[in-house]
């Protein structure tokens, strides 16, 4: 009974310490953001407005002269001009939305909205049997071992894929869930006593 009070106190102190630590981290981030914003505002404040205007006019003049020299090579942009109408959530699986309609996809995905996995329905790192060969989806491509893994494979079809599930990622997820559940139950038991 006496040790349960110590566990309860230790657990409470740990939670309070984490809350304080996270709060300080957010305050530091906010201070950094404010400092960066102030620094940027000071850098962008016009110290000599005549110099800035002259620089812009020089840039425009040089652009106009280049445009006239190579007018055949340039196509005017007639695309979307109002940023309010752009769909900023057009991509899936962590893709970057470009102009509200196109996506720059991460390594293992493709398609207009990053909806297609390059290995199909096979998750990165999983082993599968494709015909007579043992294959693994690595970085978006299905890599197969060069040797035949079974006898009498000539009778099987090449397109047949049998999944061999790897337990590595699932084991990590299960352990995390069990630790969270154990922590919750320990807290519940300690508070009821």
Curated annotation (Swiss-Prot):
Between which residues do disulfide bridges form? 91-103, 105-114
What is this protein's name?
Cryptic protein
Q: Which UniProt keywords apply?
A: Cell membrane, Developmental protein, Disulfide bond, EGF-like domain, Gastrulation, Glycoprotein, GPI-anchor, Lipoprotein, Membrane, Secreted, Signal
Would you list which residues are glycosylated?
Answer: 38, 60
- Where found, per UniProt? Cell membrane; Secreted
Presence of the UniProt keyword Cell membrane in the record: yes
Q: What is its main location?
A: membrane
UniProt xrefs under InterPro entries: Cryptic/Cripto_CFC-dom, EGF-like_dom
The similarity comment for this entry is:
Belongs to the EGF-CFC (Cripto-1/FRL1/Cryptic) family.
Membrane topology listed for this record:
Lipid-anchor; GPI-anchor
Gene3D superfamilies xrefs? Laminin (2.10.25.10)
Q: Which GO terms describe its cellular component?
A: cell surface; extracellular region; plasma membrane; side of membrane
């Amino acid at each position: 009974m006496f040790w349960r009070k110590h566990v309860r106190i230790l657990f409470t102190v740990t939670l309070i310490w984490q809350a304080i630590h996270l709060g300080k981290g957010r305050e530091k981030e906010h201070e950094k953001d404010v400092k960066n914003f102030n620094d940027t505002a000071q850098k962008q404040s016009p110290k000599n407005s005549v110099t800035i205007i002259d620089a812009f006019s020089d840039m425009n003049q040089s652009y106009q002269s280049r445009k006239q020299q190579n007018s055949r090579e340039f196509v005017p942009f007639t695309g979307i001009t109002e940023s309010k109408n752009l769909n900023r959530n057009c991509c899936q699986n962590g893709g970057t939305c470009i102009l509200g309609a196109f996506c720059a996809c991460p390594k293992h995905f493709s398609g207009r909205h990053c909806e297609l996995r390059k290995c199909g329905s096979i998750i990165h790192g999983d082993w599968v049997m494709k015909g007579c060969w043992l294959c693994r989806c690595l970085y978006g491509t299905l890599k197969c071992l060069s040797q035949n893994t079974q006898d009498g494979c000539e009778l099987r079809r090449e397109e047949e894929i049998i999944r061999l599930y790897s337990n590595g990622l699932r084991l990590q997820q299960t352990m995390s869930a069990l630790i969270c559940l154990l922590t919750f139950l320990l807290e519940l038991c300690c508070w009821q006593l």
